[in-house]
């Protein structure tokens, strides 16, 4: 599956006539948008968004991280974000939307599918922001020499087929690896939503 790291905010906290958060810079701007932030408990995504919030173009992020002082620059930006009231460090996908709904944080990074489920499936007061999203992916692997090799290969072949990958979009808003799967997602669908008729394609 393909998914992205992005962030969401609680619309009950930032509502009305607010100039609403729309960039990764806004996520780091606590003077403009107050409240505790939720961030992942590891380095993944944090270093990248910190540099982009500090003015580094997305195309240059990994070159900067690979340069002298690049990691230190990113860590300094993260320290600035978390220095006053600290940050909520999450490790599981359900934690960011739960913390947002409970108003334990005003904004949090998250995986897009988890925010989508909370917004569309549960009607949670959350808005997802796509600016500076980081595309990520997960693989399926087969252990060499394990039991039931033939059956495992058949299962793997189906899971990674155009049809199998398209079918996953019925359950979570993560994109298929195969371009050929997109043409199979013909109808608006989302099985977890209240009306079951959500167009998954923009998500």
What are these regions (language model features)?
Residues 1-99:
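Extracytoplasmic ligand-binding site segments that recognize negatively charged/polar headgroups
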Residues 5-7, 13-15, 43-47, 113-116, ...:
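Solvent-exposed loop/turn segments at secondary-structure junctions
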Residues 33-37, 83-86, 103-106, 123-126, ...:
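Loop/turn elements at helix/coil->beta-strand transitions in domains of secreted/extracellular proteins
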Residues 41, 112, 172:
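Short secondary-structure boundary segments
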Residues 71-81, 121-144, 190-191:
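Periplasmic-binding protein-like
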Residues 96-99, 115, 152, 165:
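Short, hydrophobic alpha-helical packing/hinge segments within bilobed ligand-binding/sensory domains
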Residues 108-125:
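A ligand-binding cleft/hinge motif common to bilobed small-molecule-binding domains
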Residues 134, 138, 143-203:
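Mature extracytoplasmic/periplasmic domains
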């Amino acid at each position: 599956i393909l998914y992205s790291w992005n962030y969401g905010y609680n619309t009950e906290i930032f509502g009305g006539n607010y100039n609403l958060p729309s960039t990764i810079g806004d996520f780091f701007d606590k003077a403009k948008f107050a409240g505790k932030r939720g961030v992942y408990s590891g380095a993944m995504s944090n270093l990248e968004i910190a540099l982009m919030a500090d003015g580094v173009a997305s195309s240059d992020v990994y070159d900067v991280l690979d340069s002298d002082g690049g990691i230190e620059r990113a860590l300094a930006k993260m320290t600035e974000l978390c220095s006053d009231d600290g940050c909520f460090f999450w490790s599981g996908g359900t934690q960011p939307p739960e913390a947002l709904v409970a108003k334990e944080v005003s904004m949090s990074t998250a995986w897009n599918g988890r925010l989508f489920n909370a917004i569309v499936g549960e009607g949670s007061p959350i808005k997802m922001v796509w600016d500076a999203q980081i595309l990520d992916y997960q693989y399926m692997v087969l252990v060499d020499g394990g039991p039931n090799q033939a059956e495992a290969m058949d299962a793997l072949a189906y899971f990674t087929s155009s049809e199998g990958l398209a079918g996953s979009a019925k359950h979570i808003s993560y994109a298929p690896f195969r371009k050929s799967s997109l043409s199979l997602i013909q109808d608006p669908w989302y099985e977890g939503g209240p009306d079951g008729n959500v167009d998954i394609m923009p998500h």
